[in-house]
Amino acid sequence: MRRRRAGGRTMVERASKFVLVVAGSVCFMLILYQYAGPGLSLGAPGGRAPPDDLDLFPTPDPHYEKKYYFPVRELERSLRFDMKGDDVIVFLHIQKTGGTTFGRHLVQNVRLEVPCDCRPGQKKCTCYRPNRRETWLFSRFSTGWSCGLHADWTELTNCVPGVLDRRDSAALRTPRKFYYITLLRDPVSRYLSEWRHVQRGATWKTSLHMCDGRTPTPEELPPCYEGTDWSGCTLQEFMDCPYNLANNRQVRMLADLSLVGCYNLSFIPEGKRAQLLLESAKKNLRGMAFFGLTEFQRKTQYLFERTFNLKFIRPFMQYNSTRAGGVEVDEDTIRRIEELNDLDMQLYDYAKDLFQQRYQYKRQLERREQRLRSREERLLHRAKEALPREDADEPGRVPTEDYMSHIIEKW
């Protein structure tokens, strides 16, 4: 009877040990999975990465021919944007460049620790830093037109610091760092889009055009129309106005207008004025933290994400069917628009080349880093396989047995 009881206890003890060993092994494998395979997705068939990690961006053109020389420092745009510090993104919104869509991306589509608070019926969102009630974004949809409607580079650089000092007085103890960004668009498409917008009644007459501490006089900036707006104007009428701010708008809004006497056209000769404006716009564009092109939405998204180390929740969409795209114009009219926007044509050609070179540089750098990581992982895997197994000289030991159960068994 005692032998049966002793034998029963032995069987129970062995069964308990086996259950403990199996449970411990399962826990060990789960822990090992967490450390060894964090990049795998249980929900993705075939071990593929989840959709967020798939490469949504176009492959760089290997046959792209560079037009301009840019040093590496102009192609490297990897900033340490400190949202919890005193850094501020300032969006320079040029009319009819897709800035409204991009501006909404900034307040509604960026993956943030503390998302912007956008409430129905309100035109502005509250974009506070994660650690305090201060804004990290200066834009139409966050701070409104605080420096005037569609303020340009000259206005923003002189206005933004003061506006934020008044809004966030507690931040006066440390200087802010401003990161200017903008979007550019093909000049002909942008010009036609602005004409259609004006034709529907838009005026932007509340824009300040502040420069050197004052607004332009009526003599310096005469209106193109009489009355409240220019609705119903024909394309020919739009092109015939010599004071139309749509002409070379992108260069004017990116240049330092103080260099040419602001809107005083008699300050310097016309040819020299044009050259100074173009060179200033190129310089300021290069100095910006980021700029995108309306015609390349996915590449614009890619460069913004890599520049600021921020991720968008949803990918950008390329919409080629715009109001400007529906306008039928003949070749003579297109040439006329190109002549009226000659400075913008030169700037866009320059910007497009810089944009493409930055994209290619970033993609090649990223691919190179991926290859290096893959090579290191393969070498590490081979090194682990080459290590001798320490438990190979202990026959009879169950592979899934943990250390404590092995010691108990020896007792």
Swiss-Prot record:
Q: Give the Cytoplasmic compartment stretches of this protein.
A: 11-17
State which tissues express it.
Expressed in fetal brain.
Q: What is its main location?
A: membrane
EC nos: 2.8.2.-
Topology with respect to the bilayer: Single-pass type II membrane protein
Xref: PANTHER family: HEPARAN SULFATE 6-O-SULFOTRANSFERASE 3 (PTHR12812), HEPARAN-SULFATE 6-O-SULFOTRANSFERASE 1 (PTHR12812:SF1)
Q: What is this protein called?
A: Heparan-sulfate 6-O-sulfotransferase 1
